[in-house]
Structures are given as structure tokens and as C-alpha cells.
Amino acid sequence: DSKVIYREYIQNACDQIDLAIKLGILSSDEGYVDIYIDSKKRYISVKDNATGVRAADFIEDVGDIANSNKEIGKNKGFRGIGRLCGLAYCKTLKFTTSYLGECIKSIMTCNAEKMRAMLVENKKYTLDEIWDAIVTYSTESEEKNEHYFEVEMFGINKENTDLLNDKKVRDYLSFVVPVPYKNTFVLRNQVYSYAKSIDYSIDEYCVRVNGSQIFKEYTTKLKEQSGASL
């Protein structure tokens, strides 16, 4: 399912939101992940307001595909090369980030279309040769108080049009990412109370698709195996 790229990028963002709260950059309820989908332009953006990446660390942290500071069992997102999963679904993959207090934003642009062309050529390329051929780095000025990380995918492949289906993406995310329960879910308070009684923290984040927040779509309707309501 190509929609797994949304889960990957959201989980990475949630890890950084946790860190931003720990560092005092965000309060516990300020973090968010905004997804913007433009089906006509075949464009997707996933942006958070977490820590961002320092300019001095950008190439090592984002550009080194073998490098990762993820901790197994602690962090939600995949490690290392996982951030590049979008390469399979678009013509261009772009990362833009800025760290609080720095007047600069760092940009890494990956030519996914060129990568695929090189992979089908008769000539055999090393990973480093392909990487050097498809990646460019640049910087631009930014407001000092800005802090974010944004993933952009330009030219979504025709085979992956489901990534541009707003409703399908919302439905998928409501079941696979750590978002709050709907207020209409009558067992909501019971779930929170029980979690509190066993000292268990339920991770919940504000995730929005085209401005509309995503919630868990749980209901209290019980059905038999036949499908009949109880």
C-alpha cells in the first residue's frame, strides 16, 4: 500500500514533536503535522512544527542515508533510509527544514525520475554514484523564530493516484497514526481513565489533511460475525 509513506513521515514528525516538547520548543498541545494534497498538481506536502534540523547538521542527518539517530523501541518512525520512501512515488522529493534561532533554511532536492532512469540503464552504478547524481543541496534565508521540517513530493506517479485521494488518505490515517478519539466515541473517557489508572501514556497528535483534523473513527456499534448488529 503506497499510503504507508504518510505513516512513515507522520511518525518521523511525531518523534520530533516529542523532542521539541522535551526541549521546551513546544508546549504539550502545540505540535502538529499538516498534510496538503493537491490532486490537480499531483503534489503532496507533509510539514511539522517540531525541532527542525540545524543547518550545520543537515547534510549528515538528512543527506546521509545510512545515518540515523532513531532508538529502536523508543522512536515511532523508521530509521535511516526510511525518509526516502517517497522516491518511489514521485518525480521529485524535497526536504526543507529550519531550526529555532537560525536565520536559514536547508533544502535537499532528490531527482527521483533520474534515479529510476539510472537504475534501468545497462550500466551498473554504485549507490554513491546514483546519490551524487540525483541530490542537490541549497540554503535560503528564513525567519529566526521558524522551526519546522517539510517533505514535498512533486509529480506523483500515475500508478500512485491513491495518494492523492483525500478521503482514502483520511480513512487510512484515522486507523494507523496516533491521533485522538472522536468526542462522539462514548468509550473515550473510559479509555483515558483506564490508561491513567495503569500509568500508561496514550500518544496523540494533531494531524490535519488539507486543514481538517484527523480522529480515530471508532464507534460503539457491535456486530455479530454475520454482520448483524447486536
Residue positions per predicted region:
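Interdomain "switch/hinge" adjacent to the Bergerat
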Residues: 21-77, 101-230
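A broadly tuned "polar low-complexity/structure-edge" signature
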Residues: 12-16, 87, 97, 173-184
